[in-house]
Amino acid sequence: LGDVYKRQIVDSTIIAAPSSTKNQGKQRDPDAHQVKKGNTWHFGYKAHVGVDKDTGLVHTVEVTGANTHDVVMTSKLLTGDEESVYGDSGYLGADKREDSIRRNRQGRSIRYRINRRPSQIRKNPTRAQGQLKCREHEKSSIRAKVEHVFAVVKGRFRYRKTRYRGLRKQTAKLNMLFALANLILADRPC
């Protein structure tokens, strides 16, 4: 159990909330917020998760309004025993933040292996671009494990849209769903 949680993957997904005001209070969900992803606006919550790289199991779940940026939640998703942390480009600069965890409990420095944006790769000379793309592909293939958890929650459990109002209820529901997803993922053959 000593090697568990040494290599972590952090990621988040948007859980939509009904934006309709056709209810008794004529109001939208007060804790849900809007966010633009690509060219599409979403209204709802964000589920931030920390996943063990080797087992693919979720160890930390944090739920916020959708407008909370990924990098803000990085330190809350880490256990303190990490040696390396993988994340998408939303976590760029996580190691430079004031609240970032730079050393684990053993005193070793934590390596943040965050995917770069494609525009950052194109800025380099063409000879170096091939090597950088290969490195980014390796990071992405490791990071893909977290998407399996989201596939179970959103696909198998069909929890793409919230059924409750309020952050407390969303947190309770998503904690339960990710725990159930862990049971499903732990039961699959390797």
Which positions does each model-derived feature cover?
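Helix-centered, glycine/charged polyanion-binding patches within enzymatic domains
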Residues: 83-84, 89-168, 172
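Charge-patterned, long linear interaction tracts outside catalytic cores
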Residues: 168-190
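Short helix-capping/linker segments at secondary-structure and domain boundaries
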Residues: 57, 157-162, 182-190
